[in-house]
Amino acid sequence: MTTLTRQDLNFGQVVADVLCEFLEVAVHLILYVREVYPVGIFQKRKKYNVPVQMSCHPELNQYIQDTLHCVKPLLEKNDVEKVVVVILDKEHRPVEKFVFEITQPPLLSISSDSLLSHVEQLLRAFILKISVCDAVLDHNPPGCTFTVLVHTREAATRNMEKIQVIKDFPWILADEQDVHMHDPRLIPLKTMTSDILKMQLYVEERAHKGS
């Protein structure tokens, strides 16, 4: 067993790669399960040894990839507190938030050969939870859209303009009015703890969604 800092072996990059791959699958699956887009644009794939639904719509896929490409430098520096998938109604008011709380320890005690296989087993459990989450959530109104929010640590927020990694895809400071839900219902879905990562997933659901 070896103790490493986050700087060793570009370890921040390894964790960021794992997280971005997982979040891409998770976002696609959330959009499918919560019926934000027609089921016809999704195709069944296999990720983490389980079947998942992934979009085959080029523009949607590009948006998700661009978003995570911008998140990746923040994950590498351990500057991300939460990644939030917000589902919005026709009036652009949030009806649901899928919140991924992420914690990365500064010191890592790991053996390299067991690292990824163990973490992927834990991430598989998240995917399975997302795939059945509609059983504990109310139906959403028709015509919903989505956006992705990133909650960063304070120091990172001051440097956001310096880490724009895709031209014409800038970070925009979220307006609290646009993302606030009054007294939402909180539904915990999954928690994981590993040597390289702690993550909690829960949903905040608006009490009255309309139709």
UniProtKB/Swiss-Prot annotation:
InterPro entries, sorted: HORMA_dom (IPR003511), HORMA_dom_sf (IPR036570), Mad2-like (IPR045091)
Tissues/organs with expression: Ubiquitously expressed.
Impact when changing L186A: Significantly prevents interaction with REV1; no effect on interaction with REV3L
Signal peptide location: none
GO biological process: actin filament organization; cell division; DNA damage response, signal transduction resulting in transcription; double-strand break repair; error-prone translesion synthesis; mitotic spindle assembly checkpoint signaling; negative regulation of canonical Wnt signaling pathway; negative regulation of cell-cell adhesion mediated by cadherin
Keyword DNA damage belongs to the record: yes
Region: Mediates interaction with ipaB, residue numbers: 150-211
Keyword presence, Cell wall biogenesis/degradation: no
A Pfam family recorded for this sequence: HORMA
Substitution effect: Y63A: Alters interaction with REV3L. Loss of interaction with REV3L
Main location: nucleus
Subcellular location field: Nucleus; Cytoplasm, Cytoskeleton, Spindle; Cytoplasm; Chromosome
UniProt entry keywords in alphabetical sequence: Cell cycle, Cell division, Chromosome, Cytoplasm, Cytoskeleton, Disease variant, DNA damage, DNA repair, Fanconi anemia, Mitosis, Nucleus, Transcription, Transcription regulation
Superkingdom classification of source: Eukaryota
Disorder named in the UniProt entry: Fanconi anemia, complementation group V: A disorder affecting all bone marrow elements and resulting in anemia, leukopenia and thrombopenia. It is associated with cardiac, renal and limb malformations, dermal pigmentary changes, and a predisposition to the development of malignancies. At the cellular level it is associated with hypersensitivity to DNA-damaging agents, chromosomal instability (increased chromosome breakage) and defective DNA repair.
PANTHER family: MITOTIC SPINDLE ASSEMBLY CHECKPOINT PROTEIN MAD2 (PTHR11842), MITOTIC SPINDLE ASSEMBLY CHECKPOINT PROTEIN MAD2B (PTHR11842:SF15)
Functional description taken from the UniProt entry: Adapter protein able to interact with different proteins and involved in different biological processes. Mediates the interaction between the error-prone DNA polymerase zeta catalytic subunit REV3L and the inserter polymerase REV1, thereby mediating the second polymerase switching in translesion DNA synthesis. Translesion DNA synthesis releases the replication blockade of replicative polymerases, stalled in presence of DNA lesions. Component of the shieldin complex, which plays an important role in repair of DNA double-stranded breaks (DSBs).
Subunit structure and binding partners: Homooligomer. Heterodimer with REV3L. This dimer forms the minimal DNA polymerase zeta complex (Pol-zeta2), with REV3L bearing DNA polymerase catalytic activity, although its activity is very low in this context. Component of the tetrameric Pol-zeta complex (Pol-zeta4), which consists of REV3L, MAD2L2, POLD2 and POLD3; Pol-zeta4 is the fully active form of DNA polymerase zeta. Component of the shieldin complex, consisting of SHLD1, SHLD2, SHLD3 and MAD2L2/REV7.
Protein name, entry field: Mitotic spindle assembly checkpoint protein MAD2B
This protein's encoding gene: MAD2L2
